[in-house]
Amino acid sequence: MLITIIAGARPNFMKIAPIIHEIIKQKSEGNLIDFQLIHTGQHYDEKLSGTFFEELKIPSPDVNLGIGSGSQAEQTAGIMIAFEKEILKNIPDIVLVVGDVTSTMACAIVAKKLQIRVVHVEGGIRSFDLSMPEEINRMVTDAITDYFYVTSEVAIQNLKNNGIPNNRII
């Protein structure tokens, strides 16, 4: 099983580090699992250096899409175009997205349109404030996600209120 893990901003790397550690552990135990780490470059951060990845004990990203800043539409379109080109080179079984940044939504849409399962870490979180771009990212991502890793009972209830069955919530 190949899992493509998406990170768009510095906090995403901290959230995916334990997931990467577990995948590496499972692979070392002979399980047929591997991952590809893609950084969209949505939030440029000069602190994302080799030292940062060493501290988290994760490898540097396999790919940096280098999207950078721009309007919401420019970022979304740029991420979708670059991610689709990259993912078609080695189609994974699962695309794992994190949080509520534009990269989360854009990569989830691309994966779903290619019939690839989507896992959303921090699914179900809501502010109910549609003036926040992050809330729109969360809602769109959750609408097309196959499996949700949640952080609270409130998130579970939000997903259930949207008709998501228990067997898709972890």
Residue ranges and their predicted role:
Residues 2, 93-94:
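Structural motif
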Residues 80-91:
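Short, well-structured alpha-helical segments in soluble
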